[in-house]
Amino acid sequence: MDFRLEHPRPELVRENWQSLNGVWDFEIDNARVGIWNGYEKRESLSDKINVPFCPESRLSGIGHTDFMYGVWYRRDIEIPAEWQGKRILLHFEACDYFTRVFVNGKLAGSHKGGYTPFSFDITELLSDDGNYITVYAEDDPTGEHQVAGKQSHRFNSYGCYYTRTTGIWQSVWMEAAEPAHIIRYATSSNLAQSNVTFTVDFTEASLGADVIVTALYDGEEVGQIETVVNSRRMTITLPLSELRLWEIGNGRLYDIVFEVIDGEERSDVAKGYFGMREVMLKKDGFYLNGERKFGRFVLDQGFYPDGLYTAPSDEALVADIKASMSFGFNGARLHQKVFERRFLYHADKLGYMVFDETGNWGLNTSDPMNVYNFLPEWIEEIERDMCHPSVIGWCPFNETWDKDGRRQSNELMELVYNTTYAIDASRLIVTNSGSYPCPKNDCHDVHDYEQDPE
């Protein structure tokens, strides 16, 4: 069976990492009593599940499609000897919806949201006598305060609502890093000056350390800069001796190496990539790298018959993109779901444009207070995907038209637009696709399902 063992974060890879996908212990806890009865310290659970596939899917080995309000996972882990002295980071790419993670029965941390990755430094919770992880996820898509996308809020699928996804549905993995290391980066291209600006997040231990950033194209160095880490988040601009543009159908990518040096003996090396391209919207249309382009996009909902939210293999992600391109499309609107990073990685390589959306359905957008349930995860999504050249635009909401006599909250729409623009002004923003005009929007789109081309 394919447990999806490829690296889940190809834009930032360290040498020392380990997939935790595979067979885990599993138990449904609809009464949600396990948290009070010490399930996090149990030596086993009642069933087995194939991670990263959700328990509703056939590939999980469970195939339970009724509502599951609480689910538990457990597995033993082994820390390689060569990781000794490093920080051990535990990563979850996505788990729906409210998740608590325990290591050896002790709480490592929690996360709210079903679509974005989260991580914990578990170094201090590890033991020399063996280690195990326990995960508890609560999920209830039937209310109006939780984003759920097109997961059905009824027992069965109906209309354009499909089988639900509960708990872990993307990869779980560990990596070892030095205390001083890079956490994430975003990129911004300046074609006129032939340079790229990285906005880099560092750990606190990185302050005062040296960082060397090296760009390569086809294995040849085309730029390098060395500086001192003076802030947890800082910008680094790197001039390039060769300018190769990322284009539709030709995803030209540079390799990038970040080396954080803390003293003479300790250095953390992480490798990634970036693309050079600029997007712009003018009165006469959309422009990529200064040339007017027509976006012919497919609506991709990212559901799979056997894996539901989770692609059965990495090859399936590539096949989806290549099929779309073979039909004459040059991009996709990733609809009501946050796709896994490897989809964007393949879109980057193939020159396939993407509008990044989230699964806002399920959230009552007439209530401005729901910003607390939406905005934190939306910011996490933007920060996750800002390094991908294939992502040319953001779409936080879809079709939030009047419902039961309630109007969408313009205060909510305006706040989300302003927040998105403040984080990333380099991409297009369609605040609300196919709905009423918003108080702030880069462009307004219409969903027209007329089948007669005349």
Predicted regions and their residues:
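Substrate-binding/catalytic cleft of secreted carbohydrate-active enzymes
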Residues: 319-322, 331-454
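Short hydrophobic beta-strand segments in globular cytosolic domains
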Residues: 108-109, 222, 293
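N-terminal carbohydrate-binding accessory modules
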Residues: 185-186, 257-324
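Conserved, mostly hydrophobic/aromatic
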Residues: 24, 105, 172, 254, ...
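Accessory carbohydrate-binding/adhesion or oligomerization-edge regions at the termini
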Residues: 1-60, 136, 142-145, 218-220
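Extended acidic/polar, glycine-enriched regions
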Residues: 127-130, 201-280
